[in-house]
Amino acid sequence: MALLLWVFSCSLFSLWILSFMRSQATEARHGTLAVMCDERARILQDQVKVSMNHLQALAILVSTFHHSKSPSAIDQTTFARYVERTAFERPLTSGLAYAARVTHSERELFERQQAWSIRAMNFSSKRPRAEEYAPVIFAQDAYKHVVSIDMLSGAEDRGNLLRARESGKVVLTAPFQLLNKRIGVVLTYAVYKSELPLNATVHDRIQSSIGYLGGVFDIEGHVDKLLEKLAGKEPMTVNIYDTTGESMIRMYGSSNESASGMCHVSTLDFGDPLRKHEMHCRFTQGPPWPWLAVASSYGTLVISLLVGYIFHFTDKWIAKVEDGYKATDMQMPAKDEFAATERISDMERDLKEDALFFDTTKSPSLLEISRLLNHRDPAQNVHQEEQELNLPLEAQDKLKETERKLGRMSKFITKVMKLTSASIRCLPSRFHCFNKKVWSISLLGFLLFILVIGAFDQPYNQPLGMGGEGDNNMMLKNFGFSRGRLLIDTLHGTWTKRGVQSSDTIRVDLRKMTRNNDSSGQQLKHWSSHKSSEIPAVLYVPMNGKQVIVHCNLIVDEKALVNWISNGDTDQSSKYQKETAGIQNRTDKPHLPANKSHKTTVSPWIVLLPVIMLVLLGSIIWRRCNDHRRRVQQKELELLGIMGPSRFQLQDLVAATGNFADENKLGQGGFGPVYKGYLRDQDLHVAIKVLSRRQSCQEQSAQGLREFKAEVKVMTQLRHRNIVKLVGWSDSKKQLLLVYELMAQGSLDKHLYDPEKILTWQQRYQIKFANLFNSTDKIVLDLGSALLYLHHDCEKCIVHGDIKPANVMLDVSHNAKLGDFGLARLVEHGGEPQTTQVVAGTPGYIDPEFINNRWPRTELDVYSFGIVLLEIACGKRPASRQLPNGASSLLAWVRDLYDQGKILDAADQRLNGEFNQQQMERVIVMGLCCSHQDPIQRPSIVQAMDVL
């Protein structure tokens, strides 16, 4: 029950850690989003204010130089010149317009001068023509964005103009769609006469207004690139809304806000109190998987369960030992009584014998004495060992007094010590009982836990402190600051003045900060102009044995101090956080209030140590597994060596090949070269195939090792005259070597395509009997005989997997022998083949059906045998580019000739017709049958040999 409660508690605690760390990560992520969103909102507000400042500057220019003109309307050229004068920076507005209030007579005069008409303002009530006003619109590129900026034609525009005239501030319209399909707003500002008083009332503003300026602000066009440049490490979407009405109007951003759900809203203040705007920021991706929280909770759970398991096992072991003691205690009285009875009976027998010589009637207590000497109290016997270990009386009295003072705590400590001692004694003897998986998981969890704990940034409580050093110096210690600047204010009352006024403000380098000044109770300010990358750890300030109070202002961001230091504005230091360290004497430890906003740098060893331990553990496990696998392979190869081929030492094969000299190289195989060698002790010429363990490609190296094992395993079971004999092998750490009997004539591939020497048809197929028992020159039949032996005569069916002329070797008499069993596979006779993981073979000879299903069956060898038959008969490679009529392959070309009834035209032209036509036709037809696309339609090797 206690164990289950412990597991439940550990699970709850780990879940709490997971939940807490996830909440912390979510809070930190939301804080990042808030900072990014607020920064974007501030930048957008600044952009709008730039446009507002431009309108205000233009209004001042117009009111100063043009309000007294008659008519007061401005032509395009003059207005453009005013715009250029006010555009100190490139204006962010996409178009500017000016509307002047003119009388009816002035409007008619201006229309005659400019040769175009001005739209009149529509009033709801009739007014005399002398009092009628009309807006005059002059725009600079405004026509590219809006149809017209007729700022008194609509109700909203009219209201904005009136608000701008009454307030004297820039007002905004509702967002609307521009001609370029983007969203924009119009900024409106009133133009007043230059005589407008500073403290003008609303009535004064209305009377003094002479016109209105309007600027089109393209929200999407100007802000899009700006916000894209400020995108953080994590992509986010930004939307801007006008929330003045009941429904929000989107001013910027996509309409689809589907994201992680985490959103932050920043309020935008564009300077118009009647319109409200907001910026919504969302992350486009969901929160990352909390690996740190999962690893921490998992490591805590594993370690807690391991601790609980250890204590549970210890408790069970102690209980078991106590039960054994109790059982022993129950058996001890009977054993003692039996032993005492035996001793008493022996003594009585001796006394009876002695009674013949001595008179024992006067000493009847002798038997009683013997009983007393031999009979022991069981309880006394049990606790005899404990009594021997009793402390002296004084120590016992002190121990009892301590227990009385500590009370229950002493019992708890005693019990814990007993459990710890018992667990330490029992763990070595019970170590083998622990599951290896439990220990592996526990070790991994512990390392993860250490890694997580080491990754935490621990806040420090003493970033800066003052300490005494010597009689006349005070030491300022820097415990955690690596970059930044310090403002040190030293205040004391009894220093002696040494030629420097107390009001001076000086700059000092922290590396050479020695100051002998007397402030006489006033404040002396030391300004740091430290230019190195790190602040020194120790700073000495002379104090002359007096008490000093030091105020330290920490500035982390050096860029923020550029103007502050250069201008000498000491009052700005108040915006930084102050920290005070009071020094009483030189023996006091430094103390400073904690600064939670700064954290220490994580020691790299805390992170590297678990990683190093994991690497070492993994290397040890890999080394042991590798050694075990090598020993198993060694045993297998040694067993194979007993059965047939011999195992050679590497130095013997090096000597046999002349240190693998180039002149002894016979050729290059798929996974290594082949060398010619001579074994002197056996007087035998051999061919040595080298498979290197250390190849550039790990996959090729593994394939070579598999070929080596497969070839040794198969070749030890083969005994046939048409199969190359495996003489031996060697498996050193650097190289794997296979030793074969040397075939004097080399491979069939070499003879088929030798331009100087041509294999005759008799050598290829026809049988010439030297006598009744021996035959020579039958390459086709020898190859078929080898396949017949592999498929039917062996204990297990052997699929060669790579039959081609390069693997058919010829001896002195041109007898063919099949070799290179690196891709061979053992298959049960009549059994279902197992699918192989790797498709290996030679293109042109490999069965297409095997590429699809990967079943190593005998049909695979039959297909390759058919291709070799066609190659022997036709003298052309399977994928030659010199085939007649542009045929894609040898098989397709021969099949086409067979369909045309011209099968003999496929015969090797170099034979010049010197062949038996029936035999040639038989070989070609059988080659086509064996290489049929459908494996079911192919003959078996037995049927093929019957035909051949």
Curated annotation (Swiss-Prot):
Organism, as annotated: Oryza sativa subsp. japonica
Subcellular location, record wording: Cell membrane
An MF annotation (GO) of this entry: ATP binding
UniProt-recorded name of the protein: Probable kinase CHARK
Residue ranges occupied by any Protein kinase domain in the UniProt entry: 660-948
Cytoplasmic face of the membrane: 312-437, 623-948
Keyword Cytoplasm on entry: no
Pfam families: CHASE (PF03924), Pkinase (PF00069)
Membrane spanning stretches: 291-311, 438-458, 602-622
Region Disordered, annotated ranges: 570-596
Binding-site residues, ATP: 666-674, 689
Physiological role: Putative receptor kinase that may be involved in cytokinin signaling.
Topology versus the membrane: Multi-pass membrane protein
InterPro entries xref list: CHASE_dom (IPR006189), CHASE_sf (IPR042240), Kinase-like_dom_sf (IPR011009), L-type_Lectin-RKs (IPR050528), Prot_kinase_dom (IPR000719), Ser/Thr_kinase_AS (IPR008271)
Key words, A-Z: ATP-binding, Cell membrane, Cytokinin signaling pathway, Kinase, Membrane, Nucleotide-binding, Serine/threonine-protein kinase, Transferase, Transmembrane, Transmembrane helix, Two-component regulatory system
Domain CHASE: 70-280
Entry's family note: Belongs to the protein kinase superfamily. Ser/Thr protein kinase family.
Active site: 802 (proton acceptor)
Top EC class, one word: transferase
BP GO annotations: cytokinin-activated signaling pathway; phosphorelay signal transduction system
One term under GO cellular component: plasma membrane
